[in-house]
Amino acid sequence: MIKLYNFKTRGLGVITTEALTKGFFIGSYMKKNINQSSNSRLIYNGWVETNPLGRYINHNRNPNTFIKEIGDSLNLISSQKLDAYSELTINYLDVAKILKIPQSRLKELGVDDYDYIEEEIDKVINLI
């Protein structure tokens, strides 16, 4: 369903190997396994390792996936219909907000577009 792909201009990312419908479940991670130190890894690498490929999902301000939190599970869901061989993207700042990562920690990681977090997070919350 997904595989690692080396984009010549952007490096590694994850693509679909088949078409996915809007709302398609891609993978999940148990939130209880995320501790403070792995939070920074999540933001740095993107998505937590739902499988070995999950960490390569790239950031995009207009992502085609989102996180749906159900109990202790963080589920990666397609937010739109995707053609086969589409790159999967996630908004790292939305993930940071869901995990309640402090702005000070984001700043240490070089993420400083806080106004964007506040403007865009409502869109994700409405999808969940």
Language-model region placement:
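Conserved catalytic SET/PR domain of SAM-dependent protein methyltransferases, capturing the structural core
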Residues: 1-128
